[in-house]
């Protein structure tokens, strides 16, 4: 059941992930006028996506359908396959982190402002969050999530703990690279 899967996610890791193709789409999170959302599980190793379709009917969210599909392949490097490798192989990861890496974080002297700076590769390995390797979750609020998109944003959001990391990826010469990292945890 969805509840059991969600509880498993919460128990295994105290955060969930969201995927976006572009920054503007991140504004859709929390839109109270929405009447439909999809909750997605992306299974990295099997390259499958399980999607739960919910509709808001008379104020209540109702599960309308469940769909399971393979993730499309094209001539470019597939993001899910890339991310599975990136999350589990530090040597591969070191080849796919742009140097210098753009870094945004909260100002330690002022919680209400952010610092924009850069990290070198060693600093990335010191600051990086634990990355999900088995599966990604996604709540689709209406944002595009195109398998062929040249950019992907992976948000890791804590459940009741203030954790917030955002990883920005883009395709460069057909290969994915991490080019920006945000840690705005509180």
Residue ranges, per PLM feature:
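Short amphipathic beta-strand and strand-loop transition segments with alternating hydrophobic
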Residues: 15-29, 138-144
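Short, hydrophobic/aromatic-rich segments at coil-to-beta transitions
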Residues: 30-40, 147-156
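Short beta-strand edge/turn micro-motifs at domain boundaries
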Residues: 38-74, 162-186
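Mature extracytoplasmic domains of secretory-pathway proteins
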Residues: 110-131
